[in-house]
């Protein structure tokens, strides 16, 4: 199933990685706000070996699009945005409720903390956007 999703939505693995990273960081800092640099995140993902690209800047632009989507979907709030940097990012009320909810006896926050594989990240993202 993951192969079908990747074929139909080729940027989904990047979206999953960004969504899980942002949600983990905001969850860990909650209720404090964090700043996110898409360029720094792009370099981190490239160094982890999961994403190949011609330019970290190109990847940073795609990461920025994913963060914008998370905000428009009501999962995060941010206080400001300049180029590929986001300021005062925090969990939304909706995301906090999802992370605290029990799903099959396991809350989503603990699933997010353990989501290291693409399959685990996809499962978390599906629950976040449901």
Please place each PLM-identified region on the residue numbering.
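Short amphipathic alpha-helical interface segments
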Residues: 2-54, 61
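Alpha-helix boundary/N-cap detector
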Residues: 13, 17, 54, 58-61, ...
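Amphipathic alpha-helical interaction segments
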Residues: 17, 21, 65, 86, ...
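Generic structural signal for hydrophobic core residues of well-folded globular domains
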Residues: 26-30, 70, 98-102
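Short amphipathic alpha-helical interaction segments
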Residues: 53-73, 86
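Short, amphipathic alpha-helical interaction segments positioned at domain boundaries
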Residues: 85-119
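Long, low-complexity, polar/proline-rich intrinsically disordered regions
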Residues: 121, 125-129
């Amino acid at each position: 199933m993951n192969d079908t999703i990747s074929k139909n939505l080729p940027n989904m693995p990047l979206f999953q990685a960004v969504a899980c990273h942002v949600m983990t960081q905001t969850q860990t800092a909650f209720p404090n706000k964090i700043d996110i640099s898409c360029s720094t995140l792009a370099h981190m993902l490239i160094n982890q070996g999961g994403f190949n690209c011609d330019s970290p800047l190109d990847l940073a632009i795609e990461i920025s699009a994913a963060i914008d989507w998370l905000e428009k979907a009501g999962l995060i709030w941010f206080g400001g945005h300049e180029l590929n940097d986001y300021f005062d990012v925090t969990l939304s009320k909706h995301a906090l409720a999802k992370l605290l909810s029990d799903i099959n006896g396991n809350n989503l926050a603990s699933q997010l903390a353990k989501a290291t594989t693409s399959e685990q990240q996809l499962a978390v993202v599906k629950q976040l956007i449901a």
